[in-house]
Amino acid sequence: MKKILNKFRKKEEVQPASRITSETVAHHRERILAGGRKFKYPIQYARHKLVINAIIISVVALVVVLTVGWWQLYPVQNTSEFMYRITKVLPLPVATVDGQPVLYSDYLMKYLSSIHYLEKIEQANLKTDDGKRQIEYIKQESMKDAIADAYAQKLAKDLNVSVSESDIQASFKIQRQSSSGEVSEQTSDAVNLDYYGWSSDDYHHVTEQKLLRQKVAYALDKTALATSDMITTKIKNDPSIDLNTLATTLSEGSSIKIGYTASGLVLKTNRDGGIATEAAKLTKGQVSLAFKPATGDGYYFVKLIDSNDTQVNYEYIKVPLTAFNDALSKVINNGKVNKYISIPDSTTK
């Protein structure tokens, strides 16, 4: 039986060992190297495939992150502190005004500071129906303010207006004044953080935006400047002129309404934008020339009525700035503001 089976078995032919000579050494070397390539190339292929897979995973992850971020910011309108930090890094728009992007970070900064003040300082409960209406109102006002800042940035380029670091520091110095003197920068930063949740960088940015809008408003309003020049001429011609009568006369038949205010006795350090400080420089009955207060809302003329060591009594007239608000209203009415989020009107609820 074994003999029969052996007939059908294929015997493996044993290759006789070949001798390595000087003539065959190159052939043997190539045969050995070829045998090693099967171990080398699979590793190279695996590395190449690993790189491709890593790129694909990274792209997919990036798309997912961007999609989730877009969904959180626009459809959901996530207003968390985390999303604010994201928008500070990524300059995403929340709207456009006359082609100028309105940054989402500016909108959130204004919104979050107001919410922070209500919750931490006013101890307001924003989860009630009234609180929810307050939230919607704050969203509307924050959007309006952010749009106005963005429009001011657009006009600043055309008017060649800018804010320097010295302007910002001067504003800081004015805002740090108190009845007991100037508070420190650290104290001011602590107050801003406690009241509004602003870091020092946030406060710097807010101040820069405010000053730029003021400068644009002054540069744009030629009518207010002309009115101010006319009042200056009248005061020079009649130093004892009655400011109340002057304001009434100039307002009659004019598109600009000159405001008149009497202060009564107030501290010389009264936080009124610098009006009391300006009045303290005058002699009794003297009227100042035009000056721009820290509020940045017009040209002021102040007259000192009386004073003592710590207080002043004064009256003043104000030439308001209207051109910027008029220009912004025109842009809005012409449909040149596009908002990328929907904010319900709280007045309709």
PLM region spans:
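Peptidyl-prolyl cis-trans isomerase
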Residues: 234-277, 306-313
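Envelope-exposed proteins and targeting segments
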Residues: 90-98, 103, 157-159, 212-214, ...
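Proteostasis/folding factors centered on peptidyl-prolyl cis-trans isomerases
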Residues: 189-218, 271-318
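N-terminal targeting/tethering segments
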Residues: 81-198, 202
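A short, surface-exposed interaction/processing loop segment used at functional sites
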Residues: 313-333
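Sec-exported extracytoplasmic/periplasmic mature domains
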Residues: 112, 116-119, 143-164, 168, ...
